[in-house]
Amino acid sequence: MDGLPGRALGAACLLLLAAGWLGPEAWGSPTPPPSPAAPPPPPPPGAPGGSQDTCTSCGGGGGGFRRPEELGRVDGDFLEAVKRHILSRLQLRGRPNITHAVPKAAMVTALRKLHAGKVREDGRVEIPHLDGHASPGADGQERVSEIISFAETDGLASSRVRLYFFVSNEGNQNLFVVQASLWLYLKLLPYVLEKGSRRKVRVKVYFQEQGHGDRWNVVEKKVDLKRSGWHTFPITEAIQALFERGERRLNLDVQCDSCQELAVVPVFVDPGEESHRPFVVVQARLGDSRHRIRKRGLECDGRTSLCCRQQFFIDFRLIGWNDWIIAPTGYYGNYCEGSCPAYLAGVPGSASSFHTAVVNQYRMRGLNPGPVNSCCIPTKLSSMSMLYFDDEYNIVKRDVPNMIVEECGCA
């Protein structure tokens, strides 16, 4: 590795990170390299020079890289690195192959009922707090994923299976289901009733236990109907059991006592009723016991050469991902760049660890413990909320940890 020039070594550092081989501490200056003829600029005036002030493991202290916006275009290698980074954080091997879209009417209804967002006239989805920034209050708390799965039918289903859903656990076998519900639309047909009376029915939702033959469990609910509308049925137990078995297909049978005689029709998968297609909503959490220490960092403003955070926004339309990522419209691929002189690395709070602070104190006394140099790296990462389709056409709302660089420091 010592024989590699700074620009090649920096590019290798970026690609290894995107492939998941390096941790977030290596996310330093993830920007395209300059042309071979462009020498790195000298250290800023007044700052100590030499290798001690740069991060040789990541291709230099900011001098060996150029920002994407300075290139006048988004570099292909940079975009590919960002793509791999996002897919790895979503635990996806590749981008979902969206061959046929979920009917817009069904998606609009689901988002509206969940108060999750709205669809604009141009077809784009607006989701509160999903603007590409960090989700508020997400750091240090348990991460909650929301999964929306729409009902399907096929010729392989048994005579008893009315509906089935492919519910993904997003690659996590230890998800704990906080709540899961079936949303079912009950439609009222013309029927003569006494004035002020309601139609009272009992809806039974049977869910099949995989591996137990014809064994079914049931959830019952009495429903008083005055008009057509949506109703929810708790199926938390069924979804939790599904996740624990490592399976994805949920088979349901819906039966309604007195529905026929009272002219009540449960709407299943009907081409003429796409806006009323049944769907399942799952809220699951995966606890994170790690604690982060808040540190303050500089913002790159064009006037400082010290370690700072550079903001950079990538529109998903530019990389052709707006077909499977519903919201947000883009990603803040912020990164860290700049030099790390010894006096900055030794300031309490700017180092990422106690070990780093001790090493820097040795340096300042002239007792260098070896060829260990400071890097400008993220010291605070935050979560990002995303709403997207997975391979099974589930709509997934997920708080993805450690997605956005919030602050940078020297370590």
UniProtKB/Swiss-Prot annotation:
Gene coding for it: Inhbb
Gene3D superfamilies according to UniProt: 2.60.120.970, Cystine-knot cytokines (2.10.90.10)
Top-level taxon of the source organism: Eukaryota
Induction entry: Increased expression in methimazole-induced goiter.
Name used for this protein in its record: Inhibin beta B chain
InterPro entries reported in the protein's UniProt record: Cystine-knot_cytokine (IPR029034), INHBB_C (IPR000381), TGF-b_C (IPR001839), TGF-b_propeptide (IPR001111), TGF-beta-rel (IPR015615), TGFb_CS (IPR017948)
Residue ranges of the propeptide: 29-296
Function: Inhibins and activins inhibit and activate, respectively, the secretion of follitropin by the pituitary gland. Inhibins/activins are involved in regulating a number of diverse functions such as hypothalamic and pituitary hormone secretion, gonadal hormone secretion, germ cell development and maturation, erythroid differentiation, insulin secretion, nerve cell survival, embryonic axial development or bone growth, depending on their subunit composition. Inhibins appear to oppose the functions of activins.
One example GO MF annotation: hormone activity
Covalent S-S links between cysteines: C300-C308, C307-C376, C336-C408, C340-C410
